[in-house]
């Protein structure tokens, strides 16, 4: 805390009490640049033990940025974590999975890391805007894809409409179906 540098605090193997104690101790230094890292310290971590919802729990409880320490095989957990608001993804990296040591066999290689980064960028973009309503692109093509209520056949003026007299077709530039 004295340097003012950001600190990344892994929550692997920690209870809520452990995390709370560490966060409080850190905050007492006056440095507010702390990121909690949701982590399952199991190598590799099976899907059933990832528990990505803990990211949201940590965000709500501590009201701070939360990242994800990914020890799974493949990119799925990292992509999901990004879509759930993880501010950073930590992923083990190797140039060769056959190297000795416990981390290499589940680490990602250069092409996988590039794909993960590209996927995280796309996932964040896909999260979009929570505001309901058509997007700008949808608005531009709305009339082309929506339907209008139209006469199913030629009808004389003053004719009393029956259900067989109308149909619905594109484009939606006419009378709306509602």
Protein language model features and the residues they cover:
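Catalytic cores and adjacent flexible loops of soluble metabolic enzymes
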Residues: 1-178
């Amino acid at each position: 805390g004295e340097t003012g540098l950001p600190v990344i605090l892994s929550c692997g193997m920690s209870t809520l009490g452990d995390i709370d104690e560490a966060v409080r101790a850190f905050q007492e230094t006056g440095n507010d640049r702390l990121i909690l890292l949701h982590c399952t310290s199991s190598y590799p971590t099976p899907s059933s033990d990832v528990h990505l919802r803990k990211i949201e729990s940590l965000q709500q409880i501590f009201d701070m940025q939360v990242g994800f320490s990914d020890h799974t095989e493949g990119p799925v957990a990292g992509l999901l974590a990004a879509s759930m608001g993880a501010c950073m993804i930590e992923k083990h990296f190797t140039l060769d999975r056959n190297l000795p040591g416990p981390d290499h066999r589940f680490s990602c290689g250069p092409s996988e890391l590039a794909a993960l980064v590209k996927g995280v960028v796309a996932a964040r973009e896909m999260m979009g805007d929570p505001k309901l309503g058509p997007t700008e692109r949808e608005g531009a093509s709305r009339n082309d894809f929506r339907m209008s209520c139209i006469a199913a056949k030629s009808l004389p003026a003053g004719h009393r409409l029956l259900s067989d007299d109308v149909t619905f077709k594109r484009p939606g530039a006419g009378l709306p179906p509602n």
